[in-house]
Amino acid sequence: ACYDAYGARAAAVGAEGRLVSQYTFSESWISWEMHPAGAEVVICVAGSMVLVQEFPDGQLAEVALAAGDYAINPPGVWHTADVAESATAIFITAGEGTEHRPR
């Protein structure tokens, strides 16, 4: 829903626009998402999480993030996150065309 609202507000800037958001998670994500229009920067600001990336060739990568660490989700890479206790992260996302699928 957040991507739909962003898309409506930022339609004029298209793929050049970025959605900047911060979320706190207390459990692992229940879905995957993918941003075809550009890379996404994920900055962990508190707690820890493991970002799970699925590349187009099917290869999986896990990136452990603690407070102060960051990762980049390249365009077209499906990603989700595992959270053991709690994590807060900032996301800088090329939100146009974002897709979701169940985990």
Positions of predicted regions on the chain:
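A short, N-terminal "cap"/entry segment at the start of jelly-roll beta-barrel domains
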Residues: 1-32
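Short, conserved beta-strand element in jelly-roll/cupin
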Residues: 36-51, 55, 92
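Short histidine-centered beta-strand/loop micro-motifs
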Residues: 29-36, 53-54, 62-63, 82-83
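Short acidic-glycine-tyrosine-enriched beta hairpin
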Residues: 55-75
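Double-stranded beta-helix
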Residues: 80-103
